[in-house]
Amino acid sequence: MHIVVCIKQVPDSAQIRVHPVTNTIMRQGVPTIINPYDLFALEQALQVRDHHGGEVTVLTMGPPMAEESLRKALTYGADRAILLTDRHFAGSDTLATSFALSQAIAKIGNSFGSPDIVFTGKQTIDGDTAQVGPGIAKRLDLVQLTYVAKVTSIDLRTRAITVERRAEGGTHVLKSELPCLITMLEGSNAIRRGSLDDALRAARSEIVKWNAVEAGIEDITKCGLRGSPTVVKRVFAPTPREQKAVQIDTVEKAMQDVANELVTSIFAHQPALEHELSSTRSVSR
């Protein structure tokens, strides 16, 4: 099997700065990490490879410094890493990003073999749109399985895959054909510890680097800010909410009285909650 995992190097959310003119994230000088959701996707891909054989190619789009995240992915056990980097990609929204990544995945298929599965995290912590994975699937005409918690089985003979998809109030069990694209949920698979051999191999490995032309992109106007119709009107930090702690003396009060006092206090601050609970009780009756 050939599996492609799309990861993204994201800024530490606690130290994000926003450009005052373009309303894009300023990454210079901000510590970066691999998008946490992408690590769950990477671990699931590695588990599939370990069980069924094949190789895992990790792909990211970003500035040259994103090579650091790719080497980290190699230490976890990925077989190959490709960096899609070009000044033309700067300022890409989800539409332009999914276009560039889909073109690169098509090039990967031509160079290293068509992927059977493309994995992504469900979303990134810097954008939180959850649009790039489905956008890639649409452009590559792949079946998309989103918000997947677990890959339960793969039948290479029939080219079928079964997954568990987390849904409100339960779990969906879905069966699909390969190839497909899967977006992984958080908490599904904790990333493994890389071995010493993998760490040494990662340090020696060459990171494949493609610019827009090398990735097979012919229309540069679909990349970067020029290819991004999304307009961010305003970016701001929410006003911190005041938090208070209330201490209730229970020495001389019965527990039921304490509970009633707490409920009354909560409803006083959140009247909508009282109405919602009253409606729920009426329906249940």
Curated annotation (Swiss-Prot):
Biological process, per Gene Ontology: nitrogen fixation
Matches recorded under CDD domains: ETF_beta
Protein name: Protein FixA
Pfam families named among the record's database cross-references: ETF
Function, as annotated: May play a role in a redox process involved in nitrogen fixation.
Known partners and oligomeric status: FixA and FixB form a heterodimer.
Family: Belongs to the ETF beta-subunit/FixA family.
